[in-house]
Amino acid sequence: MAYTPMIKQYKEIKEQNKDCILFFRLGDFYEMFFDDALIASKELEIVLTQRDCGENKKCPMCGIPYHVSDVYINKLVSKGYKVAICEQLEDPKLVKGLVKRGIIKIYTPATVIENENSDTGNFNYLMSISKKSNEVAISYIDISTGDVSYTNTTSDDIYKIIENEISKITPKEIIFNDHEFSTNSLETIASKFSIVLTTVNNGTDSIDFINSKITYDNTNSETTNICVANLLKYVFRYQDDLVHINSSRKYYINEFMEIDSNSVINLEIQKNLYTNSKNGSLFGVLNHTKTSMGSRLLHSYLERPLMDKEEILIRQNRVEEIFEDYELLVNLENCLDGIYDLDRLIAKLSYKSANAKDLIALKVSIEKIPYLKNLLNCNKKNVQLIGEKLDDLRDIYDLIDKSIVDDPPVILTEGNLIKPNFSNELDQLRYNRVNGKNELVEYEMSEKDRLGIKNLKIVFNKKLGYFIDVTKSNLNKVGEDYEKRQTLTNSSRFKTKQLEAIESKILDSEDEIFELEYKIFEDIRKIILENLSRIKKSADLIAIIDVSNSLAKCAYLNNYIKPDINTYGLIDVLESRHPIVELSVGQSEFITNDILIGSGKNDIQLITGPNMSGKSTYLRQVALICILNQIGSFVPATKANISIVDKIFTRIGSSDNLFKGESTFMVEMKEMSNIIKYATSNSLLVLDEIGRGTSTYDGLSLAWAIVEYISKDIKAKTLFATHYHELTELEKKLDNLINMKVDIKETNDSIIFLRKITRGSTDKSYGIEVAELAGMPKTLIKRAKSILKEIDKEDTKIDLPIADFAVQNEMEDDKNIHELKDFKDEIKNINVNEITPIQSLQLLNELVIKASKLGD
């Protein structure tokens, strides 16, 4: 088919960007054609129309105004589409024929900058992953804040490392080289977190490219260099001067508390389990921030709790100083409220997409900094230190205040941006325009008098410019100097040479004004760009104060206390509470529990009790309190002395991975294998109902062996909830294990959960009573009780002296190990060079006989 020149140009550009919806610039609109139009009209809910595309045929078309394109781009990208921006690369006024066009940007889920109406308290991370053998490198950036972070590590289980990092960072998009990875493995992880995967090719100039963009440690491994280079190349593809992206931070995974991906989900750190929203999560409880920068920093705190005691204390002390001064807390809150997202504004300035309204938002935010500095100058050491570092950016405020009108338009090329008295040249052009319009008014009045047409009027529209409108009844009064340009039903429109002269004076002035205002705005934007690092530092400090104030308010509202920190492995908390659950049931209704675990004597708590009795709440609250401690927060308790924990692992509830065809039990065993492999004596393990996914004896045996292994080989602080009451015998066998139970009050026909965790054990599961509370039919409950009574009467319950068997088996295992070691040493000591062939055969026969006598 012979397309029109413009459609042919569109098709050629689209061919190079098949995976994108192409926004094709035509005048004041971005147009979409063919399949893109069908998709965009549906997703954006805009009118679908048609356009001639050649040979009298039409193609689907829809369009959006260019000056509001960011809204529509965000909508499409949030639904998983990529958007390519095809701009006019020449001024249509200066070109005859087809305007040259080309791609200037491609927006993907992680490379779009949200508009002012978006939830900018979230990060919008792009992640890059590279690997070689057992080394993996991970880098990530939120292009709207410009922060580049990267790490590398070696592991036999690379995909577990990747999954753990993804669960913390929650990127919108991951780029990787599919020659390095098992695509299926990455797809499984990405689908779990709803992340877009994009394949890229590794470059050959990694170090040179990185150094041309950011400050970077050149001693990193080749894998790390490739990873960071891929990240930056993806960001800088169509925009080479993003000045806000200029530095990088290397972090080490073991420098922070490690929270595996299951724990991030099970503990509801960032989102709740049921609606996947922030409400009902730990973040939701803590978040009283007033700025988007503060909200994102709080996310970062929860992603990576600290391990360094001194750093934790600095955060805690800031929170304490604000907590103890409620007036300061309220004043800080009021001052922070209304500060715009400075990180996003910096990014828009760097992208050269900031408009005059963005500069006013920057001015309004900077205006609050002197008040903030004054509040922080309060003789409180840690808070005051932030205030002293805070740049008031007065010069930038003054520049914007003197130059930009208070309520500017969004469009930058139609004037009304710059205040009077800022530019003499602009003031003169405006004076000329005013004179021209005065002259126009005088000409209209003189023509009314000269022709005797009282309703004659001079009107303007974009198509005709200025013209004289004369009603039909007065057309006979018009002179020969009137040149007709348009005939309407009730009037006609005319031009005269004098009107054209006045029009030229006005329009020439307006064109010059628009051009000059835009140039002045660009100059102002350039000056601000040169000071982005100063604005960024102030934004970071504002975020720190905002988070400190937020944590202080949370502590004030919820009656938290400042914990002491120890390094000898003890977690000792009085009247602890679950920070999330207590808000749903009410603090007065929540049953508190003391926590005492660690320091070698009671490293393992074996907890028995029925379902719904409060075991899981207790398990989770211990872990959450440790996390709160290490982000520098106060904790929900009356007193606390908490050791620094290096890792938190949880195995709570079933999580069948049907996508991979794995059963509950297989998933459970894989997770336990991971925990046993990576846990240390400084870790906290939260384990609920291990072994329940298989037969009773298999499950009991595995649970027993796991507890023993943790006790003897790992020595981690462990909360182990179980229905296997036989395991309580382990308290007699293991010095670092104690039995705990959930208190139950029994009546004649029901039970009451007291939700109090105390020393001791229970040998009843109360399963029938729980079923009754859950609303099972009374006839069914009655039948179940009858069956249980008969079982107890007939003593059909198997009495398994498992503790005796376990001890006996362990002794036999130890004996076998020693015999095998002696046998191995005997073989190693044979010198084959000093014996004859006959002796060799005799020795081999003896070894076979000895081997047959050894245990399995």
Swiss-Prot record:
Pfam families: MutS_I, MutS_II, MutS_III, MutS_IV, MutS_V. GO terms for biological process: mismatch repair. ATP binds at residues 609-616. The keyword Iron-sulfur does not apply. GO terms for cellular component: cytosol. This protein is involved in the repair of mismatches in DNA. It is possible that it carries out the mismatch recognition step. This protein has a weak ATPase activity. Belongs to the DNA mismatch repair MutS family. PANTHER family: DNA MISMATCH REPAIR PROTEIN MSH1, MITOCHONDRIAL (PTHR11361:SF34), DNA MISMATCH REPAIR PROTEIN MUTS FAMILY MEMBER (PTHR11361). This is DNA mismatch repair protein MutS.
